[in-house]
């Protein structure tokens, strides 16, 4: 589902208002079909859901929606909000001290539901990866009348000590470009490190995706704000226990 990226150019984004912000989005398929809304992960843009994959879902009689989260890509960047110190915030949160974050995962769940409102979609299958899985968990639980199902991919419930990256993976994710290395080369290296050895993706495909995201809009301060929302999010187990819809964990 990624091979089309090597030959992909341009962007099919439209724009929609939600929760007081402007979001870039794209749709596939007939609007009369059941909707799927795809929510991307931390610092990821909607193109992480490959166009070919979206067309495949549409061919299975779904109306597919993908979009850029706030603070990334072609959606509004929260430039008026200070980029936080992640270390300081995590220490405060762990010791039960008040933490001021620019926005929360609940805000991003409201963004997601607001996009459905803007498209006049009453209900949707919520599908999210990584941070997007967290957002979909909240959206499905907080807005139960809008959710047909939940699919949470490579994500977590927020339970302390569960679903956390290894120290080696954490250090790799924070790795800055080495001397003479471009930001794109560094990003390709990080993504290949994090990728599954069981489902390898060629460097050329990963590079095409990274180059596309950089061309659309890379926002390092947005990464810090999104990460702050993740790091300070409360445990979602009680929310997940309230779900009355089909749920798939991948």
Roles of regions detected by a PLM:
Residues 19-95:
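Conserved HGGG/HGGXW glycine-rich cap/lid loop of the alpha/beta-hydrolase fold
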Residues 126-128, 153, 250:
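Short beta-strand immediately N-terminal to the catalytic nucleophile in serine-hydrolase-like folds
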Residues 165-238, 242:
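Alpha/beta-hydrolase
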Residues 137, 141, 150-179:
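Flexible "cap/lid" loop of the alpha/beta hydrolase fold
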Residues 128-132, 136:
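Gly/Ala-rich beta-loop-alpha elbow adjacent to hydrolase catalytic centers
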Residues 93-102, 106-124:
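Conserved acidic catalytic loop of the alpha/beta-hydrolase fold
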Residues 243, 249-250:
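Short beta-strand/loop motif that positions the catalytic acidic residue
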Residues 2-22:
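N-terminal cap/lid segment of alpha/beta-hydrolase-fold proteins
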